[in-house]
């Protein structure tokens, strides 16, 4: 047994970081890395024992439950015999879970890939922000290394010689780093010396090594930075096979609006640009991953003559606590003018002119200092003067003229109208196009608000379809790299202004606005946006189905489930499918060429799985029209049969849902909404791990029932049963009194936890004024599995 004062296995991420900070060590990295680093430091303090020596408190996944339960009990000796008894019960339960995972520990590369997909999908569904949340600064190994190079951490690691010696002692059979196919628990990832892990990644290329049959060691969790955009698209695609078919969204109410009024145009704006009912104020959506996106919109009318103006006020910088804020500007506004044919990213194209909150003017991605910075409650007046030799665009801040920002040749502009345009990043704005009786600040006498320009001198922006039956949605179907985006680009160019393209590329464009892209690259988080883009895209599709526009869904959409569930949202649209299925030789050439240019971003097992799931659409199901771009239906069907056979031979058989270890756990512990369970001992309460069945009689621990409301802990005698109401402890004395343990309330009477109890640690005082653990659980997002500030998209919100 270890004499280490800290049991690394039982620490949460925040506690691991705290211990590392006390020792002035780097607190960056995955949980396995933090455990590795802390254990090495503890061993060094205790006498320099190797970090991976069995029995020293490191993550030894072998052995029995009793061996694991004994580790780390010395620090709790002062808590009394009753505390030790409870800790043994917890450790024994953890031992059952770990042993259960070890039964399925040996897996091939394909199994490892499948497990990794499940972990990634689970993290996405639980709101994992990949290091972008305050207090959850778990960056990848790449950024951690960068921090160490800059002197921000003194990561202790084994020297190469020591790592090699430890590797030899463990034996070749235990050096495998593939992922286990067993159930993921708190101890699902094991540790390896940092030096050994780096050597494995260098030798293996993709960070994986082949496992031998019977190997019980679990692998190191592969950093997310190893994956490209295609991988996360594939993960999102797989979610549709597990999701229920959604109900068609409620159609937006038709609002009768005076079309002669100059206002923000609900058709000429981004889908995530939330416009108020009076159409004079707006903001960008900020819930979940939308906080990464910039949102823009134009006014309904433009001008090409005279001297006109409008006012814009920054009403709020919307708090986005779930977004990583260090060294990144998360609030920004650009205001100016653009052509109706320009994109919504103001300042990123030709004839798109913007003035930034940072005191910068931008056109065609070229930036230059201009004027001064502005902030909340500042009012910017935008002027356009068409009466001079060149068209002049200028600004004023709170009534103070800032001078001419842009000059445009009239010959180049060719009498095309300019429209008021705004681009927001986590900000809210409001406009005065002339509807106010009195402007925010006085304007020159020779200047006119755009609303007051005669209707015949104004130009109306493009209008969308009047009815849903006139709207069109085109779903692209094909393997990654088959040529879908190429077809979409060509088709959109042939029909300018008609389609809104929904694809990962377009989402990334709205994340990669000029300076923001550079900031993300400088902070080492650029690759994380690749994961966020597919997640945003799913929400975009839900919003799009409620808008009267024409859309192209530029995704793989190879599975029948994805096709059906997405098209079900667009009930009432003209639903079309475009299948891009080239010959196998052509497809291999295209993917090879793409890999040479962009790098290989999709694992081979993922491509094989998509080939096996590829299903051609049918007109009778959810499409009104199907177009085959290359191979026609008969030839494509033959090729798909070949792909399915190839996939079947290369991949292991898939496990059916709701089977395996999870099912056995459910049978043993009654896993349901009232009892989370775990092994033979019922350990859950009402959606919590504090449990109302832990071997004792119902109603004595956790859940709605208070632990101290009866004069007994669990009855008389015994030390825990197997779900039967046998007593666990003596009938008396009473152990909780008026204070309860794991009760429904968070405040009020002194209690041990809160409504959502999910912790193993214990406070300084058991049963009296120990609310810190419950509060920490709220902070760490255990309440309903989400961050307390996470905003989930729903139809009533937007």
UniProtKB/Swiss-Prot annotation:
One of its GO terms (molecular function) is RNA polymerase II C-terminal domain binding. Residues 688-713 are annotated as: RNA-binding RGG-box. Residues 114-128, 134-147 have a biased composition (Acidic residues). Disulfide bonds: none annotated. Signal peptide: none annotated. Residues 462-646 are annotated as: ATPase domain. CDD domains: SPRY_hnRNP. Pfam families: AAA_33, SAP, SPRY. There is a cross-link at residue 239 (Glycyl lysine isopeptide (Lys-Gly) (interchain with G-Cter in SUMO1)). The modification Omega-N-methylarginine is found at residues 676, 707, 713. Its main location: nucleus. Keywords: Acetylation, Activator, ADP-ribosylation, ATP-binding, Cell cycle, Cell division, Centromere, Chromatin regulator, Chromosome, Citrullination, Coiled coil, Cytoplasm, Cytoskeleton, Developmental protein, Differentiation, Isopeptide bond, Kinetochore, Methylation, Mitosis, mRNA processing, mRNA splicing, Nucleotide-binding, Nucleus, Phosphoprotein, Repressor, Ribonucleoprotein, Spliceosome, Transcription, Transcription regulation, Ubl conjugation. The modification Citrulline is found at residue 229. Residues 242-438 form the B30.2/SPRY domain. There is a cross-link at residues 239, 469, 490, 498, 510, 539, 548, 583, 600, 609, 638, 644, 787 (Glycyl lysine isopeptide (Lys-Gly) (interchain with G-Cter in SUMO2)). Residues 71-80, 103-113, 153-169, 192-203 have a biased composition (Low complexity). Residues 207-229, 645-657 have a biased composition (Basic and acidic residues). ATP binds at residues 478-485. The record marks 94-95 as: Cleavage. The SAP domain is necessary for specific binding to nuclear scaffold/matrix attachment region (S/MAR) elements in DNA. The RNA-binding RGG-box region is necessary for its association with inactive X chromosome (Xi) regions and to chromatin-associated RNAs (caRNAs). Both the DNA-binding domain SAP and the RNA-binding RGG-box region are necessary for the localization of Xist RNA on the Xi. The ATPase and RNA-binding RGG-box regions are necessary for oligomerization. This is Heterogeneous nuclear ribonucleoprotein U. It comes from Rattus norvegicus.
